[in-house]
């Protein structure tokens, strides 16, 4: 690989794998989250307004409340499945950012051209470079070297043509977020 502009890494743990799957779910499954929430609300409402036996109301309330409070349950299930398949063999990933590609090394190695990335997302601790809904490069913010995270963010925006976005709480979704959720559902 040519000149290295930046380096980053992550040492995966159960916590980071769970966070990775949760972020994939938050980024690509907003519509599913909305539908789960609406279904949960509908079940709770049905329990309150319908004239059915108390045991039926209790079941509706239980199911509705569970759907409302377990918004990222599908992500947790996927993370548990991935952790079980790996049987505690979690990868250490190293990223080298060159002029044209990102070089990944860890369990294997590959180069990803910057044009292949579709989303740049950050949270308090990690950066996520999405290629698609099933492929993401996750790295710790404090592992980026040289340690100027703002310069790195600008570098990635310039190379990919994308803007960074911080994943927002579900209830602060905008019309743009709903439009993007519909596009994600259609695979665009």
What kind of region is each of these model predictions?
Residues 1-43:
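N-terminal membrane-targeting/pre-transmembrane regions
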Residues 27-87:
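Alpha-helical transmembrane spans
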Residues 71-111:
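Conserved beta-hairpin
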Residues 96-97, 122, 131:
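Generic beta-strand structural signal
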Residues 102-104, 110-127:
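Phosphoinositide-dependent membrane-docking surfaces
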Residues 109-111, 118-120, 134-137, 145:
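Short, surface-exposed beta-strand-loop junctions and turns on beta-sheet-rich folds
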Residues 128-188:
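A membrane-cytosol interface segment of integral membrane proteins
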């Amino acid at each position: 690989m040519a000149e290295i502009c930046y380096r980053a890494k992550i040492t995966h743990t159960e916590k980071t794998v769970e966070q990775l799957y949760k972020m994939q779910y938050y980024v690509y499954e907003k519509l599913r989250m909305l539908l789960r929430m609406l279904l949960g609300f509908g079940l709770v409402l049905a329990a309150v307004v319908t004239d059915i036996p108390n045991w039926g109301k209790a079941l509706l309330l239980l199911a509705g409340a569970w759907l409302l409070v377990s918004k990222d349950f599908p992500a947790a299930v996927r993370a548990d499945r991935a952790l079980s398949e790996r049987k505690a063999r979690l990868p250490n990933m190293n990223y080298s950012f060159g002029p044209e590609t990102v070089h990944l090394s860890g369990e294997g190695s590959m180069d990803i051209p910057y044009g292949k990335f579709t989303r740049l997302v950050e949270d308090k601790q990690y950066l996520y470079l999405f290629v698609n809904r099933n492929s993401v490069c996750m790295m710790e913010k404090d592992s980026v070297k040289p340690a100027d995270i703002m310069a790195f963010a600008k570098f990635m925006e310039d190379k990919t043509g994308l803007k960074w976005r911080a994943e927002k709480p579900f209830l602060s979704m905008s019309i743009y977020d709903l439009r993007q959720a519909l596009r994600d559902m259609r695979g665009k």
